[in-house]
């Protein structure tokens, strides 16, 4: 590992024992009331690290664990730099604080909507708003430097404390598996923590030396696995408080909705019912058990009235077609299309994508308690400070009177960026004056899911005489999902800068720019006004823009009479990492050119600083596609933990398979038709194909991995089905025509 030098400019050294180190935001307010706190027998080493008298190394993690392995990857970075024994490492969620803001998530979740705002200004926004976000595959990329500095600083302090006792130069000491060592002398970290906390950090600070690096890139076991296996891991619905009631809720369609009828008498006849709570937009039943609450809710048989247009399939398609027929907003371009797409010889294709649901195993849930003028929530959330603000508004409280405890999440895929359940739980706790446990039913979670929106696209291109593309035009009809998210989630002072007033929405068409070397291209966003709630889904807009782009590349390759992999690589002269992923996937998968009857298809993608290529192999059985094999090659830069990366790639492939073959819904009278997993056509264990994942060694900075595998699956599978049927598949989900 290379040796780096870090100055003290970004560090403030505390004066007393245990005061530790804090990041000094010299030009900004320092009213950070909530910071990491040392418990009994613990010594604080800044905002990221504590060492206990029992030898535990406790790493503060600001990101929420929802299966992606962040409770392991981030501590591994600290432990590696510190020279710790992995068996002694523990995790502690951080409190809400500007110290743990994630400005990179502003860029990734909103698809570059804020790119015209200087990066330092974006960073200041995030810090001032304490914008703690888990999403956009940003955790390692955002926090690696801070964590390495924290580990290196604590290591230096331990070395200096040991050197003082041994009366040697501290640079002659090293750390090794939880010990400070100099010759035959050894001290456990626990024996030095108290003295080390009062030492002064050296300037410059050595990083990446003296024992560090022993854990980097190693497949260390997950820290959260034992608790999840034995059932001791707590989720939001596991919290139990004295005098708590269980609540079931049912909401009306989105829009101008009001509750017009509920049979309170029928609900109150259910044994164990405590109260019925009516809200203009929803109704809830509280009871001594969750079963009684659900039975009472069914007895209420609520009816809602909604003014305005209600979402239905015909209306959605009509709105998308009207948007596509109108003039779009140019969001990105190069060269000049001019008359290149006029006249004969133009290749054209139209694509459609149905609304896609998150379909997480754990439904939205929250536990809330109001006492002594303070509201406390245990919540599944990817944005705890935003959830706190939402709950405070709903309860009519100041934000400082609300505490949010982010819990582990049983899958989220972006759904926990929104906080309807937090608002409902806050109102219920305030109304009932006792703790409440609110769990949405499976039907409620699907009906009111903020879906990845339905989208329609028209792709047009022209080939030169030698078969290479000279013109490319993508026209995408989609709602302004990014702006809607910004209005829901971000402070008004930040949200108003989305796209700096541009009529297009960067998030809605994220990933639409081709990675290929094409002289003349343009991407237009056609804003569609749809009466449904949309949100962020794993992979973002890349989940459909990759489908449009890669399927269209296949069609251009066929028109040119060129094999699809060669066609792509010929246009990737400026991206050797993506080209290598393609060639490696083809080699590992036994790619035969995607010829008729092969059942093979291939696609590639750049996302979150990483590159991926996916080859799919499929057959058709009883009129339905059966995926037999998926081969993925990934270049995600320097890897912290290869096992975690493989888990995320494998999970992303299965998630992409679900999005390709199902996980979608139609709409009727403003609500999703889907009510349960049984109608979502999600892959079962028996449907899981053979999966091969190859990680390409790289010294590039770490890229994101939790989403990278998702977008390439659908176009690869569409290519495989084309080779079997001779037909082009231009709609998601993929359905074999009768």
PLM features: what roles do these ranges have?
Residues 2-738:
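Cofactor-binding beta-sheet edge motifs in enzyme active sites
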